[in-house]
Amino acid sequence: MDTQRFVITMNGDNISFIVGDNAINHLSEEAGKYDSIVIMISKTVEEMYANHIPDVGSFGNSVVKISLNDGESLKSLRNYQKIVKVLLERKVDRRSLLVYIGGGTVGDLAGFVASTYKRGVMMIAVPTTLLAQVDSSIGGKNGLDFSDVKNVIGTFYNPYMVIDDTVFLKNNSFIIREGMSEVIKYAIISGGDMYDTLNRCSIDNFDACATNIIKLSVKIKSEIVNRDFYDRTGIRSVLNLGHTIAHGIEGATKGSISHGKAVATGMLVEAHIGEKYGNTNHEVIEAIRDLMKRYGIEELNLKEIGPGNILRYISNDKKIMEGYINMPVPSEIGKVITMKATERMISDGINTFIKENDAS
C-alpha cells in the first residue's frame, strides 16, 4: 500500500505525518536537508531491521549515531547527561536535526534531549511500535524518571515530522495487540469512523487496515490534545480511559503484565464501575469485550492478581483527592464522562468484573 501524507496542527506547530509501508524511505530525503544530524536509535530495532533502515551515513556531512537499550531504565538523568556530553564533544549545534528510531522509551528520552539541548533542535520521530505510533509520539509529552517516579521531569515538544512505517509491525502480533488496546480506547471515546473501522478489520487482516487505523488514531488523539495541550484543564484526561485500573494492575504485578493488556482490562473494569453506578450502558461493556476478542487481547484474571493488591496501588495514585478519584468512564460508544469514584466504588467494580467472569 502507498504511503499517506497529511499535516496536523498541534499547539501552533504544523506536523507532517507519513504513514504506510516503507514510509522510512522518506527519511533520507528529509535528513539530507541538514548538515548535522543526530540519530538516536533502539539497538533492538537496529539489529532486527538492519536491511530496512536507510544507511545513516548517507544522511549528511556530519552524523552522530547513538544506539540505545530499550526499556524504562533508559529514561534517566544519567543517560540524558551522557548524550548531551556526546553532542557537545561532537560540536552539535542548534541548527542540527535529531531523529529517533524506536519505541516509546526511546521517544521519551529523545524528545527531552531535542527540547532542551541548545534550547531546542528540530526533531523527526520514527516510532517503531504500534503503541508509539498511535499514542506516545502524538501530543508533545516526553519525560525522564527520577527517584522512582515516572516522567517527573519532562517538557512538551512536538517533532516537525512523524514517520509511521507499518513494516515494523508486520509479523509481530505482540506489538499489534499492545497498540490495539489504545486504539480500542480511541474507538470507545470517539465512536464513528474508528469504531466502524475496527469492526470491519481484525488481527487477521491487520496489515491491510494498519495505515487507516494509525491515521484515524493520530487525528482523534490530536483533536483531544489540541484542546488541552499542556494538560492543565482536565480535557486531556479522557485519554486516561482504562488507565486508572491499568496502573493498579501494573503496580500489583510489578510490571509483569504488559501495558496493553492492563489498559484493555482496565477499560472493561471501569465500564463495569460506570454501569454499576448508573453511568454506563451495558452495550459499551460488550463492545469493548468484542473488540478485545477481535484483536486477540485476552482478559486478565484479576482474581489471581488480587483485588486488594490492585486497589492498594490505585489508592496511592497521585490523582486521588478528598477520598475520590476523577476517573473517565464510557457512558456510551462515542461519549466518555468523568466520574468521582471512591475506593469502595472501584472495589465494587473490580469484584463485579471478577464475578461476571467466574460465571461465564
UniProtKB/Swiss-Prot annotation:
CDD domains in the record: DHQS (cd08195)
Enzyme class: lyase
Cofactor needs: NAD(+); Co(2+); Zn(2+)
Catalytic reactions of this protein: 7-phospho-2-dehydro-3-deoxy-D-arabino-heptonate = 3-dehydroquinate + phosphate
Subcellular location: Cytoplasm
Annotated GO MF terms: 3-dehydroquinate synthase activity; metal ion binding; nucleotide binding
Cofactor note: Binds 1 divalent metal cation per subunit. Can use either Co(2+) or Zn(2+).
Annotated metabolic or biological route of this protein: Metabolic intermediate biosynthesis; chorismate biosynthesis; chorismate from D-erythrose 4-phosphate and phosphoenolpyruvate: step 2/7
Signal peptide (residue range): none
PANTHER family: 3-DEHYDROQUINATE SYNTHASE (PTHR43622:SF1)
Protein name according to UniProt: 3-dehydroquinate synthase
Protein species of origin: Thermoplasma volcanium (strain ATCC 51530 / DSM 4299 / JCM 9571 / NBRC 15438 / GSS1)
